[in-house]
UniProtKB/Swiss-Prot annotation:
Entry keyword annotation includes Cytoplasm: yes
Induction: Before cytokinesis.
Protein name, as recorded: Actin-related protein 4
Gene: ARP4
Gene Ontology molecular function: any one: structural constituent of cytoskeleton
Organism: Arabidopsis thaliana
Family stated for the protein in its record: Belongs to the actin family. ARP4 subfamily.
Tissues showing expression: Mostly expressed in flowers, and, to a lower extent, in roots, seedlings, leaves and siliques (at protein level).
Keywords attached to this entry: Chromatin regulator, Cytoplasm, Developmental protein, Nucleus
Subunit structure: Component of the SWR1 chromatin-remodeling complex and of the NuA4 histone acetyltransferase complex. Interacts with the SWI/SNF complex. Interacts with EAF1A and EAF1B.
Length: 441
């Protein structure tokens, strides 16, 4: 047991798109930055920023080739560092399909959150980490090991994302529809526990929709120029001339990262889910909406602002978007949002199905898309059993939807009754990392 009431806990929610970190008890995270890392290989380990070289005493000879490579790469983390273009900088993501694939990068993201953003000493604060519902035991143990061995935290707790979203809205039982950056996951929560067998997920998240919109715009001959690739000169008052700047050493991954930032903003600003399933005929002469790109050109976007969001409900639309052919094999196996919700509920015990239908919670950055709540509710009312009273709940505040997992963690870690739940450093030293399975079921 850990008795650390006098210092506030730190809550970290590392998503596939954004990392959120801050103090328990506050109503929003202090640090919010992209959970990707810029890496420049072959930099001599002498000029180190947030370098992946750790202070190990092992000699150069005992290092493997890949370790030597890693020790020569320089890493850049955070919104500011990532917005600056560097030659040969690749953009790497440590998370694949919601699960951590590169712990070295995660370590650097945590370090940035603690040292540069929150400016705290991790040895003085208990840590609450949010984790995906399908996280493996091996992943949890690795996280515990890093937290206790490297950051030397006094106590740790790992809580599942859907449970925290449920707590954020003051419920113990609900069906959480988490539309994140990398995937969409539907998880039933009953009395504060996730029903693992009924969790349903799909790879269609916010980033997939952003890519659909990017490809669709490019197929119409619209060039999305990243901010570093042009200069604007004022010719006359209010009139600008745009000149391309040729930068040959920019990597493809960094160019795409910058384009996704711009297209992501277009998506958030003007896209909305259509009230009825999308088809080209009914939306061909829809009024357009304008959006000004950073280089000054104004886009007029018509049908695409409805077509792209409808991919969430009808994934087969992807096959009609030029440039998205590589997903052709994946798409037939992916189900639309209403079907995923029903599939998840049908995997649960009959006794709780009614309660789940009446408390469907929307969470995640993509859930803030206009009309998503209304369309999901409408489709579910049409397709669900008559006895079910469908109610889709979503906070009217987009910040609360986007940060619901973090907010739930902030509430949980500041509860007086929660303080005996922490997995303490002394318990870790006595029982080892595998004890996390007992402390945080």
């Amino acid at each position: 047991m850990y008795g650390g009431d006098e210092v506030s806990a730190i809550v970290v929610d590392l998503g596939s798109h954004t990392c959120k970190a801050g103090y328990a008890g506050e109503d929003a995270p202090k640090a919010v930055f992209p959970s990707v890392i810029g890496a420049v290989d072959g930099v001599e380990a002498m000029d180190v920023d947030v370098d992946s070289t750790k202070t190990n005493s092992n000699s150069e000879d005992s290092k493997t080739e890949s370790e030597k490579e890693k020790s020569k790469r320089k890493l850049y983390v955070g919104s500011q560092a990532m917005s600056y273009r560097r030659d040969h900088m690749e953009v790497l993501s440590p998370i694949k399909d919601g699960i951590v694939s590169d712990w070295d990068l995660v370590d650097n993201i945590w370090e940035h959150a603690f040292k540069s953003c929150l400016m705290i000493d991790p040895t003085e604060h208990p840590m609450l980490l949010a984790e995906p519902p399908l996280n493996t035991q091996q992943q949890r143990e690795k996280a515990a090991e890093l937290m206790f061995e490297k950051y030397k935290v006094p106590a740790l707790f790992m809580a599942k994302n859907p449970v925290l979203t449920s707590f954020a809205t003051g419920r113990a039982t609900s069906l959480v529809v988490d539309c994140g950056g990398g995937s969409t996951t539907i998880s039933p929560v009953h009395d504060g526990y996730v029903l693992q067998k009924a969790v349903v997920s799909s790879p269609l998240g916010g980033e997939f929709l952003t890519d659909c919109l990017l490809k669709s715009l490019e197929s119409k001959g619209i060039k999305i120029r990243p901010r570093y690739s042009f200069k604007r000169k004022e010719v006359r008052a209010g009139e600008f001339q745009v000149e391309d700047v040729d930068i040959p050493d920019t990597t493809e991954s960094y160019k795409l990262f910058c384009q996704r930032m711009i297209v992501g903003d277009i998506k958030d600003s003007i896209c909305r889910v259509p009230d009825t399933p999308y088809d080209d005929k009914s939306y061909s002469n829809i009024p357009t909406t304008s959006y000004e790109l950073p280089d000054g050109q104004t886009l007029e976007i018509g049908a695409d602002r409805f077509k792209v969001p409808d991919v969430m409900f009808n994934p087969s639309i992807v096959q009609t978007i030029p440039g998205m052919e590589k997903y052709a094999e994946m798409i037939p196996s992916v189900r639309g949002l209403p079907h995923m919700v029903m599939e998840s509920i049908n995997k649960c015990d009959v006794d709780i199905r009614r309660e789940l239908y009446s408390s469907i919670l929307l969470a995640g950055g993509t859930s803030s898309m206009q009309q998503l709540k209304e369309r999901l509710e409408k489709d579910l009312i049409e397709e669900s059993p008559h006895s079910a009273r469908v109610k889709v709940l979503a906070s009217g505040n987009t910040t609360e939807r986007r940060f619901s997992v973090w907010i739930g963690g902030s509430i949980l870690a500041s509860l007086g009754s929660f303080q005996q739940m922490w997995f303490s450093k002394s318990e870790y030293e006595e029982h080892g990392a595998s004890y996390i399975q007992r402390k945080c079921p």
